[in-house]
């Protein structure tokens, strides 16, 4: 999967150009994918919309519906239909992914407040 934050690093990669500043760039270049050299993304993608949160990696997806107190955890390789919630069976993994999601959200909030610029 890819997201809009992958556009800039991909365009820079296609043009073999460097960023014009030291500001952090979200996303990743998809040039290796286009060249056939990338089978897995390797870094999770975060989503937040209308109270819903998701942290989606190559294998696991952590998800919380708006208003829900608990996250659900799915193994996208073994359970692509997302029918088996593994959050209780794998609490350490769920906690680690929730921490990564929280760090991503904090980074987004810092960017929105102009702290990266």
List each language-model region with its residue ranges:
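A general alpha-helix detector
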Residues: 10, 82-85
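Residues within well-ordered alpha-helical secondary structure of globular protein domains
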Residues: 13, 36, 89, 99-103
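C-terminal cap/loop subdomain of S1 sulfatases and analogous C-terminal strand-loop tails that border
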Residues: 3-76, 107-114
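Hydrophobic packing residues in well-ordered alpha-helices of helical domains and bundles
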Residues: 55, 94-97
């Amino acid at each position: 999967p890819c997201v809009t934050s992958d556009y800039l690093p991909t365009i820079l990669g296609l043009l073999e150009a460097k960023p014009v500043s030291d500001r952090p760039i979200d996303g990743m270049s998809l040039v290796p994918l286009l060249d056939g050299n990338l089978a897995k993304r390797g870094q999770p993608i975060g989503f937040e919309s209308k109270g819903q949160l998701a942290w989606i990696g190559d294998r696991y997806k952590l998800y919380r519906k708006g208003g829900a107190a608990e996250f659900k955890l799915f193994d996208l390789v073994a359970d692509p239909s997302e029918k088996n919630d593994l959050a209780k069976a794998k609490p350490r993994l769920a906690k680690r992914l929730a921490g990564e999601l929280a760090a991503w959200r904090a980074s987004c909030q810092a960017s929105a407040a102009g702290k990266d610029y």
